[in-house]
Amino acid sequence: MQNRLIEIFNETDFDQFDIELMESITSQLTDRPVELMIVDDERMRTLNKTYRDIDKTTDVLSFPMQEIPNAPLGSIVINADKVLHTAKELGHSAKDEFALLYIHGLLHLLGYDHESDNGEMRAMEEKLIIEYNLPKSLIIRTYE
């Protein structure tokens, strides 16, 4: 059996994601495992309030871990309700939307920060969405 880089904790019945795609993206960028939580709007709002003091839901959160040998890179939390809503609104699949949010969260775990860098995160997102034939990235949509 192949070792997985991603450990999934799904608190919902959402299943519209491609684990092989996410494993491929992850292994391209890191050899450290990643924890992935899939939650609903209510749980995401609670996490956002607790850890960022922002009392509203969001689509993706990242929680990096310290550089401890054999420890995961960190945790990515994706809001399944937002995935479904945004995919429908933008006219692409929930699997594609999930992959975009996963990439966004993974890049944050790797130290990229679109709020303070000089476009490096946006460039890396664009590279990955082209390579994996995904729709426009979260950052690109934000700036349009």
UniProtKB/Swiss-Prot annotation:
GO terms for molecular function: metalloendopeptidase activity; RNA endonuclease activity; zinc ion binding. One of its GO terms (cellular component) is cytoplasm. GO terms for biological process: rRNA processing. Binds 1 zinc ion. Its EC number is 3.1.-.-. InterPro entries: MetalPrtase_cat_dom_sf_prd (IPR023091), YbeY (IPR002036), YbeY_CS (IPR020549). It is an enzyme of class 3 (hydrolase). It comes from the Bacteria. Its cofactor is Zn(2+). It is found in: Cytoplasm. Zn(2+) binds at H104, H108, H114. Keywords: Cytoplasm, Endonuclease, Hydrolase, Metal-binding, Nuclease, Ribosome biogenesis, rRNA processing, Zinc. Single strand-specific metallo-endoribonuclease involved in late-stage 70S ribosome quality control and in maturation of the 3' terminus of the 16S rRNA. NCBIfam families: rRNA maturation RNase YbeY (TIGR00043). HAMAP family: Endoribonucl_YbeY. Belongs to the endoribonuclease YbeY family. This is Endoribonuclease YbeY. It comes from Nitratiruptor sp. (strain SB155-2).
